Regions:
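Active-site region of glycoside hydrolase catalytic domains
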Residues: 1-10, 53-55, 64-235
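N-terminal structural segment of carbohydrate-active enzymes
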Residues: 1-59, 63, 69-72, 76
Length: 235
């Protein structure tokens, strides 16, 4: 919310104060979804709406809104699918320790995730930890298109990604204990690649591309380790 108020960061200098006004129109929105025959609604919970000023104080009104949203989905035959983090880090954490740049965020993210699991785990079966980690980290620390608006910080970019991986893992482990009958994973913006021909050097180039642009994230989500090419690059 703070970032989009900076002139020049968004198209036509729009901001998120009202956006699509889902908070006020939630009943109408879910009714329209039901009329359209939608069977699943994937939505994101705003971390800053649950913990707006401190990780020591939960905003009950925020929890209540998502209870209402989830209940409306279920009443209308729509399966809720919750995304825990969709790029809305609370501003106070950015100011306190620079957010994802610090390992302190791992503990705070786990606390936030556990709060959601305890609140909604009996109603929601399908969960997503992080939305498109490879996008928000690249645009935040390499191309300055997203907060914290940094460019060319390659070493920091990889450290941030490592912190996000650890936060994801902590959330998954907590989820398995608290919502044993649920399903959880990460959302990833895959960048498909194809070798230009069957020459061995081009096939290997395609494999290296996948290791550096896709499996760097996917292997960690699935296997808990970096691909060999990624590790060699980091070293």
């Amino acid at each position: 919310d703070e970032f989009v108020k900076v002139p020049g960061t968004t198209f036509k200098n729009t901001n998120g104060d009202a956006a699509v006004d889902h908070y006020q129109r939630v009943e109408e929105d879910i009714r329209l979804m039901a009329e359209m025959g939608l069977k699943t609604y994937r939505f994101s919970i705003a971390w800053a709406r649950i913990f707006p000023t401190s990780m020591d104080e939960v905003n009950q009104k925020g929890l209540d809104f998502y209870h209402k949203l989830i209940d409306l989905c279920l009443e209308n035959g729509i399966e809720p699918m919750v995304t825990i983090y969709h790029w809305d880090l609370p501003q106070f954490l950015q100011e306190k320790y620079r957010g994802w740049e610090s390992r302190e965020v791992i503990t705070d993210f786990k606390k936030y995730a556990v709060t959601l699991f305890e609140a909604y785990g009996s109603k929601v079966k399908y969960w997503i930890t992080i939305n498109e980690q490879n996008i928000f980290t690249r645009m935040g620390w390499l191309t300055a298109q997203h907060p914290p608006k940094m460019s060319g910080e390659e070493k920091l970019y990889y450290q941030v990604n490592h912190n996000v991986f650890l936060a994801h893992a902590e959330a998954v482990l907590a989820f398995q204990d608290l919502v044993p009958d649920g399903m959880i994973g990460a959302s990833f913006a895959l960048h498909p690649s194809y070798a230009i021909d069957c020459k061995p050097e081009n096939v290997v180039a395609k494999m290296d591309y996948d290791d550096l642009k896709n499996y760097w994230w996917m292997d960690i989500y699935a296997h808990g380790r970096y691909p060999k090419a990624a590790m060699k690059y980091l070293q």
